[in-house]
UniProtKB/Swiss-Prot annotation:
InterPro entries documented for this protein: Homing_endonucl (IPR027434), Sporu_reg_WhiA_N_dom (IPR018478), Sporulation_regulator_WhiA (IPR003802), Sporulation_regulator_WhiA_C (IPR023054), WhiA_LAGLIDADG_dom (IPR039518)
Domain of life: Bacteria
One function term, GO molecular function aspect: DNA binding
Name recorded for this polypeptide: Probable cell division protein WhiA
Functional description taken from the UniProt entry: Involved in cell division and chromosome segregation.
DNA-binding region: 275-309
Amino acid sequence: MSFASETKKELTNLEMKECCEKAELSALLRMNGSLSFSNRRLSIDIQTENAAIARRIYTLLKKGYDVTVELLVRKKMRLKKNNVYIVRLVEKSREILADLHIVRDDFSFIRNISQELIEKKCCKRSYLRGAFLAGGSVNNPETSSYHLEIFSLYKEHNDAICELMNGFDLNSKTLERRKGYITYLKEAEKITEFLNIIGAHNALLRFEDIRIVRDMRNSVNRLVNCETANLNKTIGAALRQIENIRYIDETVGLDILPDKLREIAQLRRDYQDVTLKELGEMVSGGKISKSGINHRLRKIDEIAEKLRAGETVAKK
């Protein structure tokens, strides 16, 4: 089971107050429901591939409105061939849609979220929970990028979801997709805050555990890469210095170098594996800093380059 499916399964087991049940059910019906007329009767089909969500909708309708609800199961014939669960409501369809603030009295569709549904903070959380159950997804935190989104067919409703989320300081953003719109989060901290808001506490803890391990692993990898790069740079510099010293020795001899440079050249040639700090401790006449050793080695590099260019280097 995917991380998103586990999160939704957890959410379907939450208990709520009556006002919150109404807010969650409104989001579920608005986003997953479709209307049809048969034998002069209006019916509502709420379709999902998640059995736990279908049971949740069925229970909320029975509990909230005491109506007869049908639960149908069909097999998809394409792609994964998953089961499709259809919760069908025939009784009081118009009244329930109006009570959930999905349609007006004249049966015109309400595209945004009614403020009457979300007056209380707990109801705001519940509406977001219903929206996530109906059209939400969240990446497994072990994957390369953090991403949570809620899909909606209508721009007005999508903008309302974004506004509702940002009322909790989530910094969510919207994006148009080919068949609708999404409100999404990309920051790991904001995703965990959203999971907390909708009541997915177990999913939150799992997300955080995985994220901490992943971030620690990334930090270690960055540190190792940095140290490896520095080591490669140091080795490269040492090899260049040794090659230049050998070139000077074979071309004109190290005696052409000033005394201080000649001593460093001989030490670098004879002790190729030691660090600059260790070289500085080996010179005669007292300890020299790393920067001092580096300065002398650069002077040796310059002399080698002049010799390669055919210039004459006089002994100083």
